[in-house]
Regions:
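Alpha-helix-loop-beta-strand connector modules within alpha/beta enzyme cores
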Residues: 1-18, 22, 26-34
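Hydrophobic faces of well-ordered beta-strands that scaffold small-molecule active sites
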Residues: 16-19, 39-41, 59-63
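Short, surface-exposed linear patches
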Residues: 3-5, 38-41, 82-85
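Active-site beta-loop-alpha junctions enriched in small/polar residues
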Residues: 19-25, 44, 64-66
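C-terminal alpha-helical cap/extension of soluble enzyme domains
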Residues: 34, 45-150
Length: 150
């Protein structure tokens, strides 16, 4: 996190990505293992650390493992509790709900909940035009260049 903070200090307009930043919730790991899974004990990135990264320029966080754990746990649970169930609609519904809960929690924890109205959809052609014009090119100069040189 110190490196992320230093990058943000030197290049405050640079957006960063945290790869492999799932929190790997213990409760989801427990559900998977309780219902026949064999997921070894593991840990992820604490949500508090991700929040710290967000305060210092992180704008994309890869947390898919948490979603996969929620889905897997819900499916395993239903298939153990209802072994005669074979209709995917029956076990995909709770899986989708489990994933929705994880996503809703992350939206809130990461400060993005309630901002959907601020997003304006653009066509591929409109985005191509913005890239071609240079509008979206990284800008290094001014105070950011001075800070990076320090």
């Amino acid at each position: 996190m110190n490196v992320i903070e230093e990058i943000h200090r030197r290049l405050p307009n640079t957006h960063l990505v945290m790869h492999g930043s799932s929190s790997v919730p213990q409760d989801l790991q427990d559900i998977i293992n309780q219902y026949g899974g064999e997921m070894p004990q593991t840990w992820g990135v604490p949500v508090e650390e991700i929040q710290r990264g967000i305060r210092h320029g992180v704008r994309k966080i890869n947390v898919d493992t948490d979603n996969r754990m929620a889905i897997t746990g819900a499916i395993r649970k239903l298939l153990i509790e209802k072994p005669g169930e074979f209709d995917p609609r029956a076990y995909l519904k709770p899986a989708k709900e489990a994933m929705r809960k994880v996503c809703a929690a992350r939206f809130t924890e990461f400060g993005s909940a309630g901002h959907a109205g601020n997003i304006r959809a653009l066509s591929t052609a409109a985005m191509a035009k913005r890239y071609a014009s240079g509008e979206l090119h990284a800008k290094f100069g001014g105070d950011a260049a001075k800070a990076a040189a320090e």
